[in-house]
Amino acid sequence: MIIPIRCFTCGKEISSKWEPYQELLKIDKGKAEALDELGMRRICCRRMFLGHVDIVDKLLKFDIVKDFTQRS
């Protein structure tokens, strides 16, 4: 899904660091090293990135509106 705007535990804003994090991973940085470089020191904020599963592209494959119009 879409990365949350704030950390669920401490409330720190984390969404602005998602894209730089993805870019660092693309240039073969380790996950821990990328988070350190972005200044994410708190365990709660780090787990928000490490536990995130990006499934938006998979969800967009299902078009509910199309199914309803075909049944009518």
From Swiss-Prot:
Give GO terms for biological process. transcription by RNA polymerase I; transcription by RNA polymerase II; tRNA transcription by RNA polymerase III
| A Pfam family matched in the record | RNA_pol_N
Write out the annotated subcellular location: Nucleus
Molecular function via GO: DNA binding; DNA-directed RNA polymerase activity; zinc ion binding
Q: Name one GO cellular component term.
A: RNA polymerase III complex
Disulfide pairings: none
**Subunit text:** Component of the RNA polymerase I (Pol I), RNA polymerase II (Pol II) and RNA polymerase III (Pol III) complexes consisting of 14, 12 and 17 subunits, respectively.
What species does this protein belong to? Encephalitozoon cuniculi (strain GB-M1) (Microsporidian parasite)
Q: Which InterPro entries match?
A: RNA_pol_su_RPB10, RNA_pol_suN_Zn-BS, RPABC5/Rpb10
The free-text function statement in the UniProt record for this protein reads: DNA-dependent RNA polymerase catalyzes the transcription of DNA into RNA using the four ribonucleoside triphosphates as substrates. Common component of RNA polymerases I, II and III which synthesize ribosomal RNA precursors, mRNA precursors and many functional non-coding RNAs, and a small RNAs, such as 5S rRNA and tRNAs, respectively. Pol II is the central component of the basal RNA polymerase II transcription machinery. Pols are composed of mobile elements that move relative to each other. In Pol II, RBP10 is part of the core element with the central large cleft.
Q: Which family does it belong to?
A: Belongs to the archaeal Rpo10/eukaryotic RPB10 RNA polymerase subunit family.
Q: What is its main location?
A: nucleus
Task: Identify the stretch annotated as signal peptide in this record.
Answer: none
Point out the gene that encodes the protein.
RPB10
Top-level taxonomic group: Eukaryota
UniProt keyword list: DNA-directed RNA polymerase, Metal-binding, Nucleus, Transcription, Zinc
**Residues engaged in binding Zn(2+):** 7, 10, 44-45
Keyword Electron transport (UniProt): no
> What protein name is recorded for this chain?
DNA-directed RNA polymerases I, II, and III subunit RPABC5
